[in-house]
UniProtKB/Swiss-Prot annotation:
It is found in: Apicolateral cell membrane; Cell junction, Septate junction. This is Protein snakeskin. Required for assembly of smooth septate junctions (sSJs), together with mesh and Tsp2A. May be important for barrier function of the midgut epithelium. It comes from Drosophila melanogaster. GO terms for biological process: anterior midgut development; septate junction assembly. Residues 28-53, 110-128 are extracellular. Residues 2-6, 75-88, 150-162 are cytoplasmic. Keywords: Cell junction, Cell membrane, Membrane, Transmembrane, Transmembrane helix.
Amino acid sequence: MVSVETVGSIFIKALKLIINLVIIFLYRWGDGGEFLGIGGTWNLNEEKSADAEIVASGVMVGFLIYTGCHTIAFAFGTTKHKGELCDTIMNVVGCIMWIAVGGVALHYWKGYMSDEGFLYVNSERQVGIAMGSLCVIEGALYLLDTVLACIHYSKGDTDYTQ
C-alpha cells in the first residue's frame, strides 16, 4: 500500500516542478518579454551582477532537471530510492540555494526604481518581487520535502539500515 509520505512527496515534487517552470519563465521573459534577471547589486549604472545571475540560473535549471528526474523515478513505483540519503542532502541544498536566490532577488527588486520618472511602482519591479517570493516558497517546499525524505529514511525501508 502506498504511504501518505509517498503521496505527499509526489505531490510536493510536482508542485516544485510547476513553480520552478514559472520562476524560469519570469526570470527569462518577466520584463515585458525581455530578460528580467535576479539583480544582485546596485552600482552607478544599475547593472545586474553577473555572478548572481550565473548562480541563480544554475539553481533554477539544475534543480528543474534533478526534481524532474527524481519525480520520474517515483513514477516507477520502487521503494529503494525513496529512502536514499542523497534525496535528503539534495533537498537540504535546494532549500538553502532557493532561499538564497530568492533573498537576493527580493533585496534587489525591493529597492529597484525605474528610469522612467522615478516610479517606485512598476511592472518590472512587481514581477521581480513575485519571482523572489516564488523562489523563497520553492525553498520552503524543498524544506518540506526534506522532512518527508527524512521520514522515508527513518522508516528503514532501505538496505542501509539492515
